[in-house]
């Protein structure tokens, strides 16, 4: 039995930082298994967070320079982690950081040069997992459902609450997935105005009350009316959501409380309309799963027919890095790692670009 030893790297839309997960992944009786052996979360400093946040507005030459700079930074973090923990690594599998995602224009771009990452880390690197799917007419997102299918297929629904909320589930023998809408991105935007990176356990949100005008404004967002397949990201958030939040005069607690209600309403609407069983399970990961107030509110909106399953903190925090590690293995094995039923592409694909260190 071959054990793949992979370092998965993930930087999400919430701009919290870089997640590193060193994983052993193997196949037993046609089922993929995993063990997360070592992890590290590197918080972005103020400068890096600002550069990533503003990268969407950079001129082309400056964006490409930052693409290389960030790739070198990723390589440095990976190499230091590998050396400090004395890890035996076959490949590094990196998502990069999405700066532009306009699949309707045939465009998706994740900064973090794979060649720079490979050179600095001194390890074979797989990255750029989205562009092939977009070239095949797909949304290039979400990508995590391949891991939901292969690792967590026993659950009826898999919900990830990162910067964006996305869900995947099995329907008529096919994996279906899409971005539901807002999650931590809106909450972090609100807390950063008072100098906090996030609302720990939803403590501030719990103290607030609903601002009905804000709730109605968020629920009216056109994205929620779009048909599947669909995906969204930071550009949509900046263009459509930030103006609504910034124009609302209210306390931080009320803004957070209302936003959490909005997130839970939209998630519950999607899950309840898709559930066909008397009792369904919803497997929840991503930073939102650590928000106790959000989890209590979501469970109340889904009861009694849907039960939340919340795994270990390690899996909550590193699931995406784990799944990108899996995607890198599948790419190296030339197996399917992006599903057309999820993205709307013309066919399934084995996506990702392989870089060798020089």
Positions of the model-derived regions?
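Phosphate-binding/catalytic loop of phosphoryl-transfer enzymes
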Residues: 2-9, 103-108, 115, 119, ...
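N-terminal beta1-alpha1 ligand-phosphate binding loop
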Residues: 6-24, 289
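Conserved ATP-utilizing enzyme core subdomain
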Residues: 17-36, 41-42, 173-264, 334, ...
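Short beta-strand-loop/turn "lid" adjacent to the catalytic site in phosphate-handling enzymes
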Residues: 59-114
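Phosphate/ATP-binding catalytic cores across multiple sugar-kinase/actin-like superfamilies
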Residues: 73-81, 252-278, 331
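Glycine-rich phosphate-binding loops at beta-strand->alpha-helix junctions
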Residues: 99, 279-298
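Extended, charge-rich low-complexity interaction segments
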Residues: 158-165, 336-358
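Conserved phosphate-binding/catalytic loops in two-lobed NTP-binding clefts
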Residues: 299-323
């Amino acid at each position: 039995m071959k054990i793949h030893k992979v370092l998965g790297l993930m930087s999400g839309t919430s701009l919290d930082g870089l997640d590193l997960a060193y994983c052993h992944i193997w196949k037993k009786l046609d089922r993929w298994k995993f063990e997360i052996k070592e992890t590290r979360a590197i918080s972005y400093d103020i400068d890096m967070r600002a550069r990533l946040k503003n990268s969407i507005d950079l001129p082309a030459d400056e964006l490409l320079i930052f693409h290389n700079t960030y790739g070198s930074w990723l390589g440095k973090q990976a190499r230091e982690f590998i050396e400090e923990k004395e890890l035996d690594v076959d490949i590094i599998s990196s998502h990069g950081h999405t700066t532009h995602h306009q699949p309707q224009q045939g465009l998706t771009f994740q900064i973090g040069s794979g060649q720079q990452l490979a050179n600095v880390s001194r390890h074979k690197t797989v990255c750029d997992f989205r562009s092939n799917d977009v070239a095949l007419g797909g949304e290039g997102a979400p990508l995590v459902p391949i891991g939901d299918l292969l690792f967590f297929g026993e659950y009826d629904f898999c919900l990830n609450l990162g910067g964006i909320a996305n869900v995947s589930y099995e329907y008529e023998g096919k994996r279906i997935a899409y971005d539901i809408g807002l999650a931590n991105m809106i909450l972090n935007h609100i807390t950063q105005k008072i100098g906090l990176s996030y609302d720990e356990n939803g403590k501030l949100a719990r103290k607030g009350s609903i601002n009905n005008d804000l709730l109605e404004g968020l629920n009216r967002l056109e994205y929620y009316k779009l048909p599947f397949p669909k995906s969204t990201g930071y550009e949509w958030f900046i263009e459509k959501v930030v103006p609504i939040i910034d124009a609302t005069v209210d306390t931080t607690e009320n803004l957070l409380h209302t936003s959490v209600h909005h997130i839970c309403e939209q998630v519950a609407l999607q899950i309840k309309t898709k559930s066909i069983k008397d009792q369904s399970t919803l497997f929840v990961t991503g930073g939102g799963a650590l928000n106790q107030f959000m989890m209590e509110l979501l469970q109340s909106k889904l009861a009694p027919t849907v039960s939340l399953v919340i795994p270990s903190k390690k899996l909550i925090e590193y699931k995406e890095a784990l799944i990108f590690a899996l995607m890198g293995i599948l790419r190296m094995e030339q197996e399917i790692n992006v599903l057309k039923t999820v993205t709307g592409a013309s066919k399934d694909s084995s996506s990702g670009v392989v870089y060798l260190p020089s």
